[in-house]
């Protein structure tokens, strides 16, 4: 019964507007509380921002830095609200986490020119895993708004002087615009892609460089897919449904075309 409820919940969420994922998750879990943990760990939702009380720096919240009702800051390695026995990475993995946060902070400034980013690592039996989070919002105006959320989850398995990386990347995008001539447009959705690769590792620092290249390449591919395939298709559909010309002008144009066709058949 639980499996059927879980599958039905996922199927329902896939059919609803992605911008309302958080609200819809809360509604489903209030009806079936037993699904809460499974849904929170399985469903990607827009990232939330919180400020670290110790360092005064913003960080992003997700299921990977959550322990109960508390969230761990990547800058201070402390939980908010405070948690005495919260799960934190080992000393080695924490050093890698700090280095990765510094590296992706530069990446965020270069590629996003702002926004918020956070990196979280945790230990595995034969290596370690982590998540890279990036969020950029368009400053809401009277007529437009938008948000981009990137969630990159990876596993790194040690193999002698090589490491096997498995990366799962998700982009959650929301764009909205409203004009008097065209009305309201709301474009929301998400995309997930995966890649696995073996890369050489000389030291722990190599992991940060390897993961950085994987994320950079994946984001470039996903941006191109969004722009060329999804946005291109949406543009074609909107072009078929809407016209910049008024209805009267369109009617006159169709009437002229009919007259020309009829004259050609005389």
UniProtKB/Swiss-Prot annotation:
UniProt subcellular location: Cytoplasm, Cytoskeleton, Actin patch; Cytoplasm, Cytoskeleton
Organism of this sequence: Aspergillus oryzae (strain ATCC 42149 / RIB 40) (Yellow koji mold)
SUPFAM superfamilies given in the database record: Subunits of heterodimeric actin filament capping protein Capz
Family in the record: Belongs to the F-actin-capping protein beta subunit family.
The protein's role, per its UniProt record: F-actin-capping proteins bind in a Ca(2+)-independent manner to the fast growing ends of actin filaments (barbed end) thereby blocking the exchange of subunits at these ends. Unlike other capping proteins (such as gelsolin and severin), these proteins do not sever actin filaments.
Coiled coil: none
The protein, known as: F-actin-capping protein subunit beta
InterPro entries recorded: CapZ_alpha/beta, CapZ_alpha/beta_2, CAPZB, CAPZB_N, F-actin_capping_bsu_CS
Quaternary structure and partners: Component of the F-actin capping complex, composed of a heterodimer of an alpha and a beta subunit.
Single GO MF descriptor: actin filament binding
Keywords annotated in UniProt: Actin capping, Actin-binding, Cytoplasm, Cytoskeleton
Pfam families for the chain: F_actin_cap_B
One Gene Ontology term, aspect cellular component: F-actin capping protein complex
Domain of life: Eukaryota
GO biological process: actin cortical patch organization; barbed-end actin filament capping; filamentous growth; mating projection actin fusion focus assembly; mitotic actomyosin contractile ring assembly; mitotic actomyosin contractile ring contraction
